[in-house]
């Protein structure tokens, strides 16, 4: 008797979103496999999916082992350990497909987030309140930091150089807040000039539900981010984005072939590949330490990219 499969998906929500096309293909190509997905990092973005929602389980689900795992083979896909990924031949969604489906490098569909009425209305209410508070009609969501960011006293640092430098993103926000209702998507508050904030307020809502954040991005006019979750939400919502890449390669972590994505690669020609989830070397992060330091010209380029949308 052939056993079905229990796939274990770990990591952040961006990885979950990028896994969706691979699982859709697996379901289509393996109709006899009654597979499940064990969500070690949460099942938020399997929710609402027409077929995958019923296959997804939080890893604390009661009876998960005895009722669902015990009679299945366990598989843990790791896209960062796929040859095509760490040699810059594919993106994250394709790496999941290679690892899960074993069909080699091929084109995969776009992920999709399925929001319900409550999520849409709640996000629309948040955005409308911010528009009224700022007096601006156009809304820009800014995600300045990736998940590797750390705080040390008053300092905000990303040792992997995937995030904006604090002084750079503050400069960018100070320019764009005069033209847009800006919503900062960050668990870490961004320190802005208080006197200017009274004239040009910037919203920093603490929204714990990532699905609400995805709906906020959907309602907004544009997204500005780095190597972080938000851009994968934008892709799954068919939105527009300006993405700044430094220590990571656009082909791996973003969508350079999507005309709705304007990717400004400030690390081009300067970075080396950091073997995330492969080794614990620190040499690469040290080499990449300054790749996200922006020049005045690059800051102008970023602001102009946002204005195009």
Put a short name on every predicted segment.
Residues 4-6, 139, 222:
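Structural motif
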Residues 78-87, 110, 114, 122-194, ...:
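Active-site donor-nucleotide binding/catalytic segment of nucleotide-sugar enzymes
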Residues 36, 67, 71-77, 183, ...:
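Hydrophobic/aromatic beta-strand patches that form the interior of the parallel beta-sheet core
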Residues 54-59, 204-206, 262-268:
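Short acidic-hydrophobic, aromatic-tinged amphipathic segments that line or gate anion-handling sites
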Residues 1-93, 215, 230-232:
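Active-site and donor-binding regions of nucleotide-sugar-utilizing enzymes
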Residues 82-129, 257-309:
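Leloir-type glycosyltransferase catalytic cores
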Residues 17, 155-251:
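Donor-binding and catalytic core of enzymes assembling or modifying cell-surface/extracellular glycoconjugates
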Residues 8-9, 38, 142-143, 185, ...:
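Short hydrophobic segments within beta-strands
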